[in-house]
């Protein structure tokens, strides 16, 4: 089986403007990025077209969310068809901010995943526990339930990247230790093996998100079951290049 290609996603969240994002894109386009790493930038929806036009073709573009149907009376939403129409190929779904700030349920996220995949987008599907859940010892229960809601809606796993993001580590400066990340990633791979297939477990990339920086990325990347990162704040800074090249 081919080794899993390292995957680094940058989630710009609700940040940036044409000037600052243009400068960031200029930095990324001019940087020497490892050819062995797949790179995708998640732009705010209003800048998706701008990002796709300005970024080198070798860097992918992701929307940060989408809805579960192709079109209709859903004010404020965008569809996978629209994302594809401007040339972007990915979408981030189930991010903890969508779950906890905007109240998206496991069921809705599963429906969105199903529709995005049916429309031909790649999906970065996010899961992760909150601090009280980790302290209560139910990390596995929470992430397995979230993973099941996604897995029930996936027929072809080749377009899915699973992103484990412990909610207590997102934007807090707290990072799961490399050992904590590896432990959950290994359990997730075991869940895929038991509930989907061994082939899917071996080939699906499981990436880590949660205060990843240029300083901690190398040790995280060295873990056997960590296949890349979903990077928040640091993806808006030049150190994003160091994170992309963490394996090299």
Swiss-Prot record:
It catalyses: dihydroxyacetone phosphate = methylglyoxal + phosphate; D-glyceraldehyde 3-phosphate = dihydroxyacetone phosphate. It is found in: Cytoplasm. Pfam families: TIM. One of its GO terms (molecular function) is triose-phosphate isomerase activity. It comes from the Eukaryota. Its EC number is 5.3.1.1, 4.2.3.3. Homodimer. Belongs to the triosephosphate isomerase family. This is Triosephosphate isomerase. The lineage of its organism: Eukaryota, Metazoa, Chordata, Craniata, Vertebrata.
């Amino acid at each position: 089986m081919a080794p899993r290609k390292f995957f680094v996603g940058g989630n710009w969240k609700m940040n940036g403007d044409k000037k600052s994002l243009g400068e960031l894109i200029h930095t990324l386009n001019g940087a020497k990025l490892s050819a062995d790493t797949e790179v995708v930038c998640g732009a705010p929806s209003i800048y998706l077209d701008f990002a796709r036009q300005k970024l080198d073709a070798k860097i992918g573009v992701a929307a940060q969310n989408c809805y579960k149907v192709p079109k209709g009376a859903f004010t404020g939403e965008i569809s996978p068809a629209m994302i594809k129409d401007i040339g972007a190929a990915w979408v981030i779904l189930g991010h903890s901010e969508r779950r906890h700030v905007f109240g998206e349920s496991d069921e809705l996220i599963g429906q969105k995943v199903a529709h995005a995949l049916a429309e031909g987008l790649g999906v970065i599907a996010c899961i992760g526990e909150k601090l009280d859940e980790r302290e209560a010892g139910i990390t596995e229960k929470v992430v397995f339930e979230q993973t099941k809601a996604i897995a029930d809606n996936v027929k072809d796993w080749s377009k899915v990247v699973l992103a484990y993001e412990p909610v207590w580590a997102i934007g807090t400066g707290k990072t799961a230790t490399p050992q904590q990340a590896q432990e959950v990633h290994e359990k997730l791979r075991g869940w895929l093996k038991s509930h989907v297939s061994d082939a899917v477990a071996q080939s699906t990339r499981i990436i880590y998100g949660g205060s990843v920086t240029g300083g901690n990325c190398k040790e995280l990347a060295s873990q056997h079951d960590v296949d890349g990162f979903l990077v928040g704040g640091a993806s808006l800074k030049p150190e994003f290049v160091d994170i992309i090249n963490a394996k090299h």
